[in-house]
Amino acid sequence: MREEEMESSSEGETNKISRCKATGSDNPDEDYVEITLEVRDETINTMKAKATLRSVLSGRLKTMVKSLSFASRRLDRSKSFGAMFALRGLRFIAKNDAVGRGWDEVAMRFDKLAVEGKLPKSKFGHCIGMVESSEFVNELFEALVRRRGTTSSSITKTELFEFWEQITGNSFDDRLQIFFDMVDKNLDGRITGDEVKEIIALSASANKLSKIKENVDEYAALIMEELDRDNLGYIELHNLETLLLQVPSQSNNSPSSANKRALNKMLSQKLIPTKDRNPVKRFAMNISYFFLENWKRIWVLTLWISICITLFTWKFLQYKRKTVFEVMGYCVTVAKGSAETLKFNMALILLPVCRNTITWLRTKSKLIGSVVPFDDNINFHKVVAFGIAVGIGLHAISHLACDFPRLLHAKNVEFEPMKKFFGDERPENYGWFMKGTDGWTGVTMVVLMLVAYVLAQSWFRRNRANLPKSLKRLTGFNAFWYSHHLFVIVYVLLIVHGYFVYLSKEWYHKTTWMYLAVPVLLYAFERLIRAFRPGAKAVKVLKVAVYPGNVLSLYMSKPKGFKYTSGQYIYINCSDVSPLQWHPFSITSASGDDYLSVHIRTLGDWTSQLKSLYSKVCQLPSTSQSGLFIADIGQANNITRFPRLLIDGPYGAPAQDYRNYDVLLLVGLGIGATPLISIIRDVLNNIKNQNSIERGTNQHIKNYVATKRAYFYWVTREQGSLEWFSEVMNEVAEYDSEGMIELHNYCTSVYEEGDARSALITMLQSLHHAKSGIDIVSGTRVRTHFARPNWRSVFKHVAVNHVNQRVGVFYCGNTCIIGELKRLAQDFSRKTTTKFEFHKENF
């Protein structure tokens, strides 16, 4: 074949022209074909293919036209909408790869991993930063080696640099060719159906998508059907490129879209971090923001601290005027002042854990709920516990290090006024004090409270402490649960200790019981209610499902008169596991449903045993291919085989306040989505009811639709987790015709869109969803996003859609992103007209 230069197109030409012409050559007896491709403002070399005219037209001509059209697309891509998509597509090195920051780090790793100057294939992934995708990396390595025409299993540093340049280059077409070569192992320029199956299975393994791997034949057939329209049995590079560069259609002509673009631009400018040059003004602004966002907590803490200081001062001054002050001095005033705060705090610490009272107050009184931070009840319980620890320290140190020594070393004349408190016999040593009732009761209380306090810390309660096995058995939730019930003994000892105190003889001066009477009776009354209320009776288990990811869902009958609000939680007791333990779980059914449901993830001994019990029940019925086990009362003849359950509740939680907002932003991590699913179900039920009213099929339904828009973001690590709430996802897609609920599911095991490891999955997802309306990752009608959300973009999206509105942000899950979400809510509230109010779940 010979090449000739082609003249550039004329300036006024508007269309690309492809033409074939037969012309003469140096040898007039030989036929040849010249193919000329003219592109506006570009010049491309042409190729003359020497051969018989019939042969060229039947085969090679077709191939060359495809190649040249591919070249023309390369030139035109820079002017297309897909340009940005192409630039960020098919990246082999992810943004968060540990060594994906430059060649220097890769070279350093090569020096550490190389053996005799060569890097083995097994170390290639570690060297370039693709540590978690060994199979994919091996195929990439072999493809790069094949391109060099060798079959070596190790490479030099020079070869590694060449490979690095290829996989990190800016050219999408070069990366596309590498990806194509990974599949096209015989380098014939064609990908067969079997090779498509291999690359699908490889991509599924790299992204931990086991279900896609199980259905690889179906998905390979789908790709071949889409790309091999002529039924040739193979696809070529240009077919793959066409599919990979498909981008979602976007409407840019509507006024709303134009307005949103303008708002987006405005928000981006407003949200640029700025720093006020005046430090005083900046400090004042930060203080004002702090008070506006935390005023409920501030007034409660201020009141609590003020009461503690007042009680301490009152008792301090009282004892300063007494005779004992002349012998014991300020030691006794500090001891008695701290003792008074201890009485108050030991009474107060019970109130935040009176769950029924708190639930009743936050449900029945909006006024009280608007000024009291009920969401922080457990945090306040911990703050009061810290206050008790400080009080114990001051009280004990003042006695042991100051009071008692001064009393032991007092002269007879000095001790004379103390005889009416201690008797004629003078104390001789510390043992004398310890033998007294107030001595041994005080020490016992301190020991018991210390045990309960230590075992309540998260590193012990959640078995995070690095302890020997023999000691590890003494930690965990069970240890926390039972040690906290030592408070019964502590309160009995506290009353005894207060009654036998040395320096107060009159009964009306022994005030400990006065402080404790109301809180203790209230708490005792609550425990009696839990024991005898209808909600604490046995419930009938209607359905059980065991999902991938160690999640157990229980569907139970709703007790008569049982009323709750979406977002609340209940306590569950299973006597077959432990007759004494009650564990809290968010309700996942909506208040309008005729059943109760919870989803329980196994994270400890109790939940593991509960799942094991119900798994045995679920093994008899038929199972689905995904590993989902189900047992249904409608299919079972003997209900008694279900373990007996008791429930207690419902109890209030932050998520129940969602009805105070027209717009909701719901964020759940993993199993933390449970209270939010209940909210979604409630909004969905309202949509169904509204549709029934509009159709006239049911005129007796209460028309209550407070929520106008709900954005739900659910982030989970495993593909199997997406099955937990697949039913509600499909219902939203079916009934929410007006788009009131916007669902976004994120699977973090899949590499972000644009990564070469997820490119085929993304392509396959689009094809399958377009054809069947089902997402291949979740198995629902809701498309799954990959990697993690950009939370700033999420807040911007909501702010653009809801100008001058209040948005309730409700989060439940791991604490890892609480800080980020809270900062974003504050930032957008301060700099935009959309006000985000952040709420988080406590347990």
UniProtKB/Swiss-Prot annotation:
Residues 148-159 are annotated as: EF-hand-like 2. GO terms for cellular component: membrane. It comes from the Eukaryota. Residues 336-495 form the Ferric oxidoreductase domain. Ca(2+) binds at residues 184, 186, 188, 190, 195. It is an enzyme of class 1 (oxidoreductase). This is Respiratory burst oxidase homolog protein B. The lineage of its organism: Eukaryota, Viridiplantae, Streptophyta, Embryophyta, Tracheophyta.
